[in-house]
Amino acid sequence: MFPRDVRIESYDPELAKAIAAETQRQEDHVELIASENYTSPAVMEAQGSQLTNKYAEGYPGKRYYGGCEYVDIAEQLAIDRLKQLFGADYANVQPHSGSQANQAVYFALLQPGDTILGMSLAHGGHLTHGAKVNASGKLFNAVQYGVNDQGLIDYDEVERLALEHKPKMVVAGFSAYSQVIDWARFRAIADKVGAYLFVDMAHVAGLVAAGVYPSPLEHAHVVTSTTHKTLRGPRGGIIVAKGADEDLVKKLQSIVFPGIQGGPLMHVIAGKAVAFKEALEPGFKAYQQQVVKNAQAMANTLIERGYKIVSGGTQNHLMLVDMIGKDVSGKDAEAALGKAHITVNKNSVPNDPRSPFVTSGLRLGTPAVTTRGYVEQDCVDLANWIADVLDAPNDDAVIARVRDAVSAQCRKYPVYG
């Protein structure tokens, strides 16, 4: 029997110390990594529930274990809410991550050696869109498209590559692209060569759910996403589709289980259900609108301070700061800003002369600060402080001044009140 009063602090003080330190870091540092956000206490409560104890291989109403009547309720709630959120008629909430959701789509619809056409990681794509170091680039013949000199997706190049290589699947989506994607154009290109259109909307799923970014579900054969990032849920993955035929649905269902996964993480699925309910609330739309306003305020301020934003600005939650020609690398900029309690990530930019371990860019995003309550003026201030540090990355006095300002701002907007 486990006594209910045992806490991590008393049983495992070493781990408790690390958790406490991370909790304090999240309160004291401003979070600008575009793929990070804060979950609600309700989501965390679900993840910490006794649902973690339950094995539930299979799907609601069709399990390989007994005793699943209550976890069936949790998973069905997640499925129904997810369908409502995106106007989907198919939803799978079992993928453990966005990468595994993507893997499921590839394995369901392709054979090893088939050609896929995806966005280059160096130009804003994702590892799982055909990067050579990823399984998607090893198991499949991955052809990569990129952006033009203006930092925009070159749809003519995408079409030319599709006509030349005849991919079985066209992959649309990104990890570092700040403009609106023309999903209809991608579908037209895919149709020209008889390919599937697969969209990974992990970064913009929350914006799509709120109607502030175009939905790919009207155009794609299948769509995946993570459930954290702009959706503000637990870390996990989903697969959705609209108008999918029965054969496609069967392939997707059977590849997630038993194809690539065994038992689903029922406590995480419960957390997803909570997050989807939160995303259906009226306030979620206002939150996502503010995310975009904050990103635009930040990007415009950085441009005014002499920093180049790839594509010239942003229409979503993120921006990519191009520092080619600057004296500071992405790696050094990340470190200097970290000392000032501003958390960012270094990122390669198009035609980057530096290695991916050093880079000439920074990726910034506003989902987390917007969750804290930041509005445009706060992000203007933040962008000016970022520019101050980037202008003098080795000046301890500047870093100390910015750190003090950031600390005051964080106290004004606590993560958890």
Curated annotation (Swiss-Prot):
Reactions this protein catalyses: (6R)-5,10-methylene-5,6,7,8-tetrahydrofolate + glycine + H2O = (6S)-5,6,7,8-tetrahydrofolate + L-serine
UniProt site (Plays an important role in substrate specificity): H228
Cell division in keyword set: no
Top-level taxon in the UniProt lineage: Bacteria
Residues bearing the modification N6-(pyridoxal phosphate)lysine: K229
Alphabetic keyword roster: Amino-acid biosynthesis, Cytoplasm, One-carbon metabolism, Pyridoxal phosphate, Transferase
Enzyme nomenclature, EC number: 2.1.2.1
Main localization category: cytoplasm
The protein's annotated pathway: One-carbon metabolism; tetrahydrofolate interconversion; Amino-acid biosynthesis; glycine biosynthesis; glycine from L-serine: step 1/1
Cofactor annotation: pyridoxal 5'-phosphate
Residues annotated as binding (6S)-5,6,7,8-tetrahydrofolate: L121, G125, H126, L127, S355, P356, F357
GO cellular component, one term: cytosol
GO biological process per UniProt: glycine biosynthetic process from serine; tetrahydrofolate interconversion
Gene Ontology MF terms in the entry: glycine hydroxymethyltransferase activity; pyridoxal phosphate binding
Subcellular location: Cytoplasm
Top EC group: transferase
Record protein name field: Serine hydroxymethyltransferase
Taxonomic lineage from the root: Bacteria, Pseudomonadati, Pseudomonadota, Gammaproteobacteria, Lysobacterales
